[in-house]
């Protein structure tokens, strides 16, 4: 049976030179304000983007597991759950607070900044920003470790299949799951390695971005541990839109990992391989130089869902004072 026609969010929009990643929590009794504001974000994007369409402003709005139950009545995404912290023999992938994720992108930072401010203004005291990262494109789409990032991203129909929910969860066809982690790099330790040794850590050549042959690629390299296959040998893909970030005055250099996928299980297996090891104890060597300081799993519904969301759960519906007129009663029956 074919899935209904829907409008996915711009998950597969091309990489841009500028991005802002905002993670926020929803305060007590903030559900109604956030619920209303989410339905107006499309209008904000159109209004700000109209000033200069060549800047290709976009945003992907995503909701965490706990927040979903506070914001929406009715069905919930079948695989949405809180991010599970991973504690390995050497490194930890922490789970950190986050109810809302805004992935804002454009050719220039000015419109990203304007949209971020407008979104937060629309939600006011109902939300608290717990993490804000301003990403930028580095030379040749490289991360701050000096390697090209996103080489193995799928494109075209393969990317759509890798990121878009279909018949397996018909209530949310066209939607997507997204993981985020903020990594901070130990540049002094990294730069103490020779280029050849750095290539063994990553599993690719540094200059020309070629994957090392299997006989030269260590089992604990980043590339080796991030190849996930089905039982029949078919490789499972995700779409990464990672961005470098940093503050030179603080000596902070990092990568913001953001991975979109049709099911969270693919990214979760990658993270288990990296932090717990595959086999157990064979952990990703890049973690000796890059420390995860945040971690979250969110759900990116369709534009249709955000523009016309289901009602608030009964427990989160604002209580009207006795004798007051429900404005909703003037709008006809609830959706």
Curated annotation (Swiss-Prot):
Chief subcellular location: other
pH-dependence of activity, as noted: Optimum pH is 4.0 or less.
EC category name: oxidoreductase
The keyword Nucleus appears for this protein: no
Keywords: Encapsulin nanocompartment, Heme, Iron, Metal-binding, Oxidoreductase, Peroxidase, Virulence
Active site: 149 (proton acceptor)
EC number in record: 1.11.1.7
PROSITE patterns: DYP_PEROXIDASE
Region Targeting peptide, annotated ranges: 312-335
Cofactor(s) essential for the protein: heme b
Statement: the UniProt record of this protein carries the keyword Metal-binding: yes
KO phenotype (gene knockout): No change in ability to grow on an exogenous siderophore (mycobactin), suggesting it does not have an iron-chelating function. A double dyp-enc deletion mutant cannot produce encapsulin nanocompartments, cells are highly sensitive to H2O2 at pH 4.5 (mimics growth in the phagolysosome), mutants exhibit significant dysregulation of redox homeostasis, survive less well in C57BL/6 mouse-derived bone marrow cells and are more sensitive to pyrazinamide treatment in infected BALB/C mice.
Molecular function terms, GO-annotated: heme binding; metal ion binding; peroxidase activity
Catalytic activity: 2 a phenolic donor + H2O2 = 2 a phenolic radical donor + 2 H2O
An annotated GO cellular component: encapsulin nanocompartment
Localization: Encapsulin nanocompartment
Co-factor: note: Tetramer binds heme in a 1:1 ratio. Addition of hemin to purified protein yields a tetrameric protein.
Residues that, per the record, bind heme: 222
Pfam families: Dyp_perox_C, Dyp_perox_N
Protein family (similarity comment): Belongs to the DyP-type peroxidase family.
Subunit note: Homotetramer, presumably also in the encapsulin nanocompartment.
Free-text comment on this protein's domains from its UniProt entry: The C-terminus (residues 312-335) targets the protein to the encapsulin nanocompartment.
Described function: Cargo of a type 1 encapsulin nanocompartment in situ; this cargo protects against oxidative stress at low pH. When expressed in the cytoplasm (absence of the encapsulin shell gene) it is almost as protective as the intact nanocompartment; its encapsulation has a modest yet significant effect on protection against oxidative stress at low pH. A heme-dependent peroxidase, it probably does not have deferrochelatase activity. Converts guaiacol and H2O2 to tetraguaiacol, also acts on 2,2'-azino-bis(3-ethylbenzothiazoline-6-sulfonic acid) (ABTS).
Protein name: Dye-decolorizing peroxidase
Gene: dyp
């Amino acid at each position: 049976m074919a899935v209904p026609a829907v409008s996915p969010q711009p998950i597969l929009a091309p990489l841009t030179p500028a991005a802002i990643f905002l993670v926020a929590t929803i305060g007590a009794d903030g559900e109604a304000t956030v619920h209303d504001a989410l339905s107006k974000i499309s209008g904000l994007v159109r209004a700000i983007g109209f000033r200069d369409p060549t800047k290709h402003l976009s945003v992907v709005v995503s909701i965490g597991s706990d927040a979903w139950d506070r914001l929406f009545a009715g069905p919930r995404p079948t695989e949405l759950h809180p991010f599970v912290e991973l504690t390995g023999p050497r490194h930890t992938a922490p789970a950190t607070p986050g109810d809302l994720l805004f992935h804002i992108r454009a050719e220039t930072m000015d419109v990203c900044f304007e949209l971020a401010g407008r979104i937060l203004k629309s939600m006011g005291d109902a939300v608290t920003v717990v993490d804000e990262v301003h990403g930028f494109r580095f030379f040749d789409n490289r991360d701050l470790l000096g390697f090209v990032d996103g080489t193995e991203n799928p494109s075209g129909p393969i990317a759509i299949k890798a990121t878009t929910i279909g018949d397996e969860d018909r209530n949310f066809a066209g939607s997507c799951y997204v993981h985020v982690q903020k990594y901070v790099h130990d540049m002094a330790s990294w730069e103490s390695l020779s280029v050849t040794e750095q290539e063994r850590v990553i599993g690719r050549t540094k200059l020309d971005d070629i994957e090392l042959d299997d006989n030269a690629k260590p089992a604990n390299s980043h590339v080796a541990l991030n190849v996930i296959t089905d039982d029949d040998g078919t490789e499972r893909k995700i779409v990464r839109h990672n961005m470098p970030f940093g503050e030179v005055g603080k000596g902070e250099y990092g990568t913001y990992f953001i991975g979109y996928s049709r099911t969270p299980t693919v990214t979760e297996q990658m993270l288990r391989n990296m932090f717990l090891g595959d086999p157990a104890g064979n952990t990703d060597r890049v973690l000796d130089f890059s420390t995860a300081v945040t971690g979250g799993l969110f759900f990116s519904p369709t534009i249709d869902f955000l523009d016309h969301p289901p009602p608030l759960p009964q427990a989160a519906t604002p209580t009207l004072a006795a004798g007051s007129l429900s404005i909703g009663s003037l709008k006809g029956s609830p959706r």
